[in-house]
């Protein structure tokens, strides 16, 4: 059994920083379920695990593989409750094609800031069969360790892109672009298409003005009962779940 050097632990901890992740083009994942989901989807540069985990997974393909004690793993881990394995994976390179949005249902995020929200939205996209999420340049980094953990493995199947949202939406032509607004139409009373882009906004400010002007289908998630005083808004991840569920419900009945 090897022990992790101080330099290796320092390197693992440095992956909390976007600058280092970007330079190295890697990301960190922890825990048996998450690491197990990602192995086979992304090249693994480094994996450290306890002997009990390695015995259950004898055929790991990693550039560097180290058996470590639980104590060592605890020192390296970024989690409050360290688990049996952590791994460093290479970031994938994806090409963003507007045709994907014309042909299927995709999500767009306008400056979502919370890593947990982004991770949960990726997990939701995975559940609802949405393959692409297009993020504004100021949206939180998908490879933030907190985001990766919150995806629960969804990052293996959902492609996340960063671009200028206004420019991308303009490239879609007359493709349906949906967004939620207080003055939008009740989404339960509107026919929703099986293709197009659903735009979700920033936690505090909603969808930005420039992007809002480009949305051609304004929706509203009604509270119940109508007109009753309620909380100001839904969390962006919860709102995404409600909207995606209605899109898929309507698609199932067509």
Regions found by a protein language model. Give the residues of each.
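Active-site/ligand-binding-proximal alpha/beta "capping" segment
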Residues: 179-231
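Boundary-proximal intrinsically disordered activation/regulatory segments immediately upstream
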Residues: 1-54, 139-140
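Structured adenosyl-cofactor binding patch, chiefly the S-adenosyl-L-methionine
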Residues: 127-128, 142-154, 209, 213-254
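Glycine/small-residue-rich loop that forms an oxyanion/phosphate-binding "nest" at active or ligand-binding sites
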Residues: 65-90
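RNA substrate-binding interface of SAM-dependent RNA methyltransferases
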Residues: 98-184
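Amphipathic alpha-helical repeat scaffolds
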Residues: 31, 113-121, 231-239
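Short acidic-hydrophobic, aromatic-tinged amphipathic segments that line or gate anion-handling sites
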Residues: 1-3, 29, 66-69, 158-167
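Short beta->alpha connector loops at strand-helix junctions that form conserved
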Residues: 68-71, 110, 136-137, 159, ...
